[in-house]
């Protein structure tokens, strides 16, 4: 009987120990989650300065904002891109001179949506770099600098240089690029300190975007799927980001020279 009592006691202690362990584990997860989203960690996902909660932001001739500024005669576009995506790089390289000039003269505003859309191929590359793009847009009011950083990032030579680096080496390279473009040490440190928050925003956006019905209406593809680069204006369907006819299918609509209905199909 004493032997059975001892077994019951040991069994009870085991259950109690497991219960305490489980409680502490769950409590720690809650604490860690709250800390991850608290002001103490300086993660800006809950209260971004210049960007939206999905990491998107608008570049114009004057500043960086969360939404388009209503101005007559200004063309507005949404631009979804992944820094690892070959077509995203190709389109950016072909259009960046026009976009840069149009941002300067105020004839165009673009809401950029950095994504982690190719994570199955790129590992942490797309996530890390997209987070840096959103982060720099969040801490800076200089739209010209941010677009120059994007042009350096959406570049084949840069991709080849960075894509196989470890996390630490990749961040060092990105920091060097940001410094060369002219971001202050304070701005760069702010992004580095808050990078997990920006990564969280990018990941959430990249997952949620696949569930949004609006892209089925905008997509020029037969299967109505979302793809990158996904670029669309206030009216019409998205441009054909996979097209080899850059002048007619991409630059033409961006310049307002070719109606989207003629090139986006």
Region annotations inferred by a language model:
Residues 70-71, 103-105, 222-225:
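Extracellular/periplasmic catalytic domains that process cell-envelope and extracellular macromolecules
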Residues 89-174:
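Structural alpha/beta surface segment adjacent to cysteine/selenocysteine redox centers
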Residues 2-36, 175-265:
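C-terminal cap of thioredoxin/glutaredoxin-like
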Residues 25-71:
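N-terminal, intrinsically disordered, polar/charged segments of Gram-positive cell-envelope systems
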Residues 70-86, 92, 109-114:
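Short active-site neighborhood of thiol/selenol oxidoreductases, capturing the structured segment around
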Residues 80-82, 113-116, 153-154, 234-236, ...:
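Active-site-proximal beta-strand/loop segments in catalytic clefts of secreted hydrolases
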Residues 75, 83, 130-131, 229:
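Residue-level detector of short, conserved catalytic/binding motifs and their immediate flanks
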Residues 73-76, 105-110, 139-148, 181-187, ...:
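Loop/turn elements at helix/coil->beta-strand transitions in domains of secreted/extracellular proteins
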């Amino acid at each position: 009987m004493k032997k059975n009592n001892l077994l019951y006691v040991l069994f009870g202690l085991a259950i109690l120990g497991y219960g305490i362990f489980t409680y502490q584990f769950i409590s720690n997860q809650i604490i860690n989650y709250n800390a991850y989203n608290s002001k103490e960690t300086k993660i800006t996902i809950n209260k971004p300065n210049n960007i939206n909660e999905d990491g998107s932001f608008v570049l114009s001739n004057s500043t960086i904002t969360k939404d388009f500024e209503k101005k007559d005669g200004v063309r507005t576009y949404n631009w979804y891109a992944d820094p690892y995506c070959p077509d995203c790089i190709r389109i950016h390289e072909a259009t960046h001179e026009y976009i840069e000039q149009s941002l300067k003269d105020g004839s165009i505003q673009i809401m950029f949506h950095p994504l982690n859309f190719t994570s199955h191929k790129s590992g942490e590359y797309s996530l890390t770099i997209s987070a840096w793009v959103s982060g720099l847009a969040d801490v800076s009011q200089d739209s010209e600098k941010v677009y120059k950083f994007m042009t350096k990032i959406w570049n084949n030579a840069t991709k080849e240089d960075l894509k196989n680096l470890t996390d630490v080496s990749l961040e060092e390279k990105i920091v060097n690029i940001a410094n060369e473009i002219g971001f202050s040490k304070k701005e760069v440190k702010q992004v580095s300190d808050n990078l997990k928050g920006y990564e969280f925003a990018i990941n959430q956006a990249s997952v949620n975007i696949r569930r949004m019905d609006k892209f089925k209406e905008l997509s020029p593809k037969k299967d109505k799927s979302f793809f990158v680069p996904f670029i669309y204006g206030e009216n019409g369907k998205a441009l054909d980001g996979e097209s080899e006819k850059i002048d007619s299918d991409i630059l033409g609509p961006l310049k307002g020279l070719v109606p989207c209905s003629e090139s986006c199909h």
